[in-house]
From Swiss-Prot:
Enzyme class: hydrolase
Catalytic reaction annotation: D-glycero-beta-D-manno-heptose 1,7-bisphosphate + H2O = D-glycero-beta-D-manno-heptose 1-phosphate + phosphate
Protein localization: Cytoplasm
Annotated pathway: Nucleotide-sugar biosynthesis; ADP-L-glycero-beta-D-manno-heptose biosynthesis; ADP-L-glycero-beta-D-manno-heptose from D-glycero-beta-D-manno-heptose 7-phosphate: step 2/4; Bacterial outer membrane biogenesis; LPS core biosynthesis
Name of protein: D-glycero-beta-D-manno-heptose-1,7-bisphosphate 7-phosphatase
Sites where the protein binds Zn(2+): 89, 91, 97, 99
Residues the record lists as binding substrate: 7, 15-19, 50-53, 57, 100, 129
Organism: Bordetella bronchiseptica (strain ATCC BAA-588 / NCTC 13252 / RB50) (Alcaligenes bronchisepticus)
GO biological process: ADP-L-glycero-beta-D-manno-heptose biosynthetic process; lipopolysaccharide core region biosynthetic process
Amino acid sequence: MKLIILDRDGVVNQDSDAFVKSPDEWIALPGSLQAIARLTQADWTVVLATNQSGLARGLFDTATLNAIHDKMHRALAQMGGVVDAIFMCPHGPDDGCACRKPLPGMYRDIARRYDVDLAGVPAVGDSLRDLQAAAQAGCAPWLVQTGNGRKTLAQGGLPEGTRVCEDLAAVAEQLLQEA
């Protein structure tokens, strides 16, 4: 199985300091849906791992989050792309959970669900916490320079072996060339 794990905000869609709180606020980044479609069509299983503390903060509810994800799934389907599963942490930063990135809990859940060893599985994010969680789980961290990615790159301290690409389309291109 060829598995790839993506962060959502800043990788697939535009990020917002005020959170993505409704389907109207969910706007795909240029080329991201096409990248997922290319990966899907090349037999990759695409999974999201996303912190959604807006739930804990009361900024939106589960029904709204599901509506946001429905919008994403519909847009992807039009291009032949599929996100097989969405793993998310609904907790706030101070809740003490094991699933909130930079902790690797969501990634370990993915490994159990798909019965895979995550060693070398590409995990794409735009923030240091995405990359830290991925590296702790044994994934190969990839930083995109969309969302908070440029700032993350400038701040340094990336996990060893982190690969850097302009955006998700460039990640997909690299992976498909290497396959």
